[in-house]
């Protein structure tokens, strides 16, 4: 399969099944990180992932890591921590700060200036959302991602205190389900999401689920600025 070159003025994408097998899921190169292109990407099961200041790369991996409704796993140690957690969890109160914090990593980052600009614009349009974890007035953890109907595509998370990002994940996952959410897209499986119950499914199964659930209209109250319960 070829690696597709995107047109700067056309936000459409090739079909995800045309992605390369090696590296797994790499579909296209080029284009921009505009809100219009990002929305088209997530509607199609594609996301950007590349080194800052380089040409955008677009992916649709096979398999895909997901956490379906009702499958969240909370181990005994984490459950005990959540009952006693001294943190406050909020929704959509500090998106810009969350994506900035996610970009600061000792091991390097894929979140460069154009990614920040694109997702901040998408947040202003009500399509991208953040979860914040606070200890007093200090932002100590959080996550951000993109909503596609009854699917939430998690992009990145950060933690400056013990279990802070897990608190964000658990609180938001339960909140999203209460409003009819059906699937949390984790993109690529890692130890963090696997511990919370994420599994890998074939890309075709993910795309079928996305096609079905993206048509669902989630109550806009789901995305109001608010506090979330653990």
Curated annotation (Swiss-Prot):
Q: What is its main location?
A: cytoplasm
A single GO BP term for this record reads:
protein catabolic process
Superkingdom assignment: Bacteria
> What is this protein called in UniProt?
Leucyl/phenylalanyl-tRNA--protein transferase
Report the EC code(s) recorded for this entry.
Answer: 2.3.2.6
- Write the record's keywords in alphabetical order, separated by commas: Acyltransferase, Cytoplasm, Transferase
**Catalysed reaction, written as an equation:** N-terminal L-lysyl-[protein] + L-leucyl-tRNA(Leu) = N-terminal L-leucyl-L-lysyl-[protein] + tRNA(Leu) + H(+); N-terminal L-arginyl-[protein] + L-leucyl-tRNA(Leu) = N-terminal L-leucyl-L-arginyl-[protein] + tRNA(Leu) + H(+); L-phenylalanyl-tRNA(Phe) + an N-terminal L-alpha-aminoacyl-[protein] = an N-terminal L-phenylalanyl-L-alpha-aminoacyl-[protein] + tRNA(Phe)
TM annotation in the entry: none
Q: Which gene encodes it?
A: aat
State where the protein is found: Cytoplasm
One annotated Gene Ontology cellular component of this protein: cytoplasm
Q: Which family does it belong to?
A: Belongs to the L/F-transferase family.
Q: What does this protein do?
A: Functions in the N-end rule pathway of protein degradation where it conjugates Leu, Phe and, less efficiently, Met from aminoacyl-tRNAs to the N-termini of proteins containing an N-terminal arginine or lysine.
Instruction: State the Pfam families in the record.
Output: Leu_Phe_trans (PF03588)
Instruction: Give the Gene Ontology MF terms in alphabetical order.
Output: leucyl-tRNA--protein transferase activity
């Amino acid at each position: 399969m070829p690696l597709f070159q995107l047109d700067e003025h056309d936000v459409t994408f090739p079909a995800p099944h045309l992605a390369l097998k090696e590296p797994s899921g790499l579909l296209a190169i080029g284009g921009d990180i505009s809100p219009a292109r990002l929305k088209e990407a997530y509607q199609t099961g594609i996301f950007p992932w590349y080194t800052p200041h380089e040409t955008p790369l677009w992916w649709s991996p096979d398999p895909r890591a997901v956490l379906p409704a009702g499958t969240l796993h909370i181990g005994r140690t984490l459950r005990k921590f959540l009952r006693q957690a001294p943190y406050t969890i909020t929704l959509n109160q500090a998106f810009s700060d969350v994506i900035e914090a996610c970009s600061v990593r000792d091991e390097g980052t894929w979140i460069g200036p154009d990614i920040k600009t694109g997702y901040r614009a998408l947040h202003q349009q009500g399509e991208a959302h953040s979860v914040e974890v606070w200890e007093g007035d200090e932002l100590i953890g959080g996550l951000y991602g993109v909503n596609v109907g009854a699917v939430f595509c998690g992009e990145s998370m950060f933690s400056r205190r013990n279990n802070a990002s897990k608190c964000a994940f658990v609180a938001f996952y339960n909140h999203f389900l209460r409003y009819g959410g059906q699937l949390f897209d984790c993109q690529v499986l890692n130890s963090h999401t696997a511990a919370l119950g994420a599994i890998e499914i074939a890309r075709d199964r993910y795309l079928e689920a996305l096609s079905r659930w993206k048509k669902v209209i989630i109550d806009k109250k789901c995305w109001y600025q608010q506090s979330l319960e653990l």
